[in-house]
From Swiss-Prot:
This is Small ribosomal subunit protein uS12. One of its GO terms (molecular function) is structural constituent of ribosome. With S4 and S5 plays an important role in translational accuracy. The modification 3-methylthioaspartic acid is found at residue 89. Coiled coil: none annotated. The gene is rpsL. GO terms for biological process: translation. One of its GO terms (cellular component) is small ribosomal subunit. InterPro entries: NA-bd_OB-fold, Ribosomal_uS12, Ribosomal_uS12_bac. Keywords: Methylation, Ribonucleoprotein, Ribosomal protein, RNA-binding, rRNA-binding, tRNA-binding. The keyword RNA-binding applies. NCBIfam families: rpsL_bact. The lineage of its organism: Bacteria, Pseudomonadati, Pseudomonadota, Alphaproteobacteria, Hyphomicrobiales.
Amino acid sequence: MPTVNQLIAKPRKAPVKRNKVPAMEANPQKRGVCTRVYTTSPKKPNSAMRKVAKIRLANGFEVIGYIPGEGHNLQEHSVVMIRGGRVKDLPGVRYHIIRGVLDTQGVKSRKQRRSKYGAKRPK
C-alpha cells in the first residue's frame, strides 16, 4: 500500500479500456462486401468447419465475420451487414454477419429463435 507522498509523486494510473470492436466505430451495424468466403477450424478442444467471410467494410476496414446458422448463400462480392460479437473458439473473428439482410438469406426451416437467423414465420 503506497503512502500519501508516494501517491502525490506518482498518482494511480487508470486501466486502459480496449475497444473490442474497433471497426464498428461506435455504430450498431456496418455494411461491407465479402472478399473471401471460406471455412476454418476452431481451437481445441472443439472440432468443426466454421463458415466465415473476409469483409471489406464501407469505412475501409477489413474484418472477418462469422456466418451463423446452417447453410448460406454468400459468395465473393456479396453485400452483407455485420454486427459486433466474437466467436470464442475462432481466433480473430470479432464480428457476426446478420442473416436475412441485404444479400444474406435467412436460414430456411428455422422454427425457434427465428429473428436471430432472419427466418420468416412458417405458415
